[in-house]
Amino acid sequence: MRGRPSLLLVYMGLATCLDTSPHREQNQVLDIFLDAPEAQSFLVGRRRFPRANHWDLELLTPGNLERECLEERCSWEEAREYFEDNTLTERFWESYTYNGKGGRGRVDVAGLAVGLTSGILLIVLAGLGAFWYLHYRRRRLRGQESCLQETGLIIPLSPQTPQSPPLPPGLPTYEQALAASGVHDAPPPPYSSLRRPH
């Protein structure tokens, strides 16, 4: 069952691609080419928005100062293309903000944001890398130190565990207690009666 639907799809795809009827070719040719009024409306129509120096058929459309130099930075050649006169171009170029002589230009916010973000990210990554390196190095040095102590090559000056104070001597045995003389060697006092007074 799985093979039959896929075979049907392959057959339909090949039949569509290999269809060479003359009626179909004529319709495709008519769809590609436009009539003269439609082509003219594409080139100079008001529906198109100028795209400021981005593939907008500049060779066929007249130069526009706003599009060429005010919306974007332009070069001397683009300004010369608009003015078509060296004296007018010189006058404009002296007052133009981005003329290469300095001047106050606008801040490129996108470039500034990308630069700051990448700088901060670089600092954070460098900090994390340094932290990881130091942590790994400290762990490795501790591991080497314990291995050397176990083999007896390094004897620590101060013991790792503090020594407990010596235990007090335990109680003497019965024989030792009888042999020793001391303050408490006297026999107990005699008991007068086993009864308690009421």
From Swiss-Prot:
In this chain, composition skew of type Pro residues spans 162-171
Q: Where is the signal peptide?
A: 1-17
Q: Known post-translational modifications?
A: Gamma-carboxyglutamate residues are formed by vitamin K dependent carboxylation. These residues are essential for the binding of calcium.
Q: Give the Cytoplasmic membrane side ranges.
A: 133-198
4-carboxyglutamate carried by residues? E72
**Topological region Extracellular:** 52-111
What's a single GO CC term here?
extracellular region
Outcome when changing Y191A: No effect on interaction with NEDD4
Pfam families linked to this entry? Gla
Domain Gla intervals? 52-98
Intracellular or extracellular location(s): Cell membrane
Query: Could you tell me one molecular function GO term of this UniProt entry?
Result: calcium ion binding
- The keyword Membrane appears for this protein: yes
Q: Where is this motif: PPXY motif?
A: 188-191
- Kindly list the residue ranges recorded as spanning the membrane: 112-132
Where are the residues of the annotated region Disordered? 156-198
User: Assembly state and interactors?
Assistant: Interacts with NEDD4. Interacts with transcriptional coactivator YAP1.
User: What name does UniProt use for this protein?
Assistant: Transmembrane gamma-carboxyglutamic acid protein 2
Q: Which organism is the protein's source?
A: Mus musculus
Gene it is expressed from: Prrg2
